Swiss-Prot record:
It comes from Campylobacter jejuni subsp. jejuni serotype O:6 (strain 81116 / NCTC 11828). It catalyses: dTMP + ATP = dTDP + ADP. GO terms for cellular component: cytosol. GO terms for molecular function: ATP binding; dTMP kinase activity. GO terms for biological process: dTDP biosynthetic process; dTTP biosynthetic process; dUDP biosynthetic process. This is Thymidylate kinase.
């Protein structure tokens, strides 16, 4: 089973994944972008830009990472439990300047149509996101601000709705304001 955690920065994806590592010791834990050696280099380029990158070039770099991630991680472990911190869904949401049909086609190509079966979508409100952003050093994407993140979160919801019409997926939407213990319990039940 391929499971992905989706949500904007600071909603607790990493915290919940860490809790699952204690339970699913044989699972494959990964992340996008940056789940491979190539991906780490691309992630560095994308998050710490030293020069401007066009939106189209940025999209193609993320797709290159995704294709490599599929080859190295997803394809070789497709018969195991795979839990990923983000996926192509975030890629579609962050690429807000492009149409969903185009993004879906490009991601389908990069992933050879290998999609997650279950999606855990953690949602945060403006206050929660602002509070958590203020507690960390920001990368170039995080520096775009709270309004940017809320617009991405809105786009994530729209992408999930779009994907329900395209592929067979189960989606669990959770309020990130809940305690990490309560969220963990709901996630465990969803994964059974």
């Amino acid at each position: 089973m391929y499971v992905v955690f989706e949500g904007i920065d600071c909603v607790g994806k990493s915290t919940q994944i860490s809790l699952l590592k204690e339970i699913y010791k044989d699972a494959i834990f990964t992340l996008e972008p940056g789940g491979t050696e190539l991906g780490k280099h691309l992630r560095e380029i994308l998050l710490n830009k030293t020069h401007p990158i066009s939106k189209r070039a940025e999209l193609l770099l993320f797709l290159a990472d995704r294709a490599q991630h599929f080859e190295e991680i997803l394809k070789t472990n497709q018969n195991k439990l795979i839990i990923s911190d983000r996926s192509f869904i975030s890629g579609m949401a962050y690429a807000k300047d492009f149409e969903n049909d185009l993004l879906f086609a490009l991601n389908s190509f990069a992933l050879e149509n290998f999609f997650p079966q279950k999606i855990i979508f953690l949602k945060g409100d403006a206050n929660l996101i602002q509070e958590r952003l203020s507690q960390k050093e920001l990368d170039s994407i995080e520096k775009r601000g709270i309004e940017y993140f809320l617009s991405v979160q809105d786009k994530l919801e729209k992408v999930l709705h779009f994907l329900k019409e395209k592929i067979s997926i189960e989606i669990l939407t959770l309020d990130a304001k809940e305690s990490k213990e309560k969220l963990h319990q709901q996630i465990k039940e969803f994964l059974q």
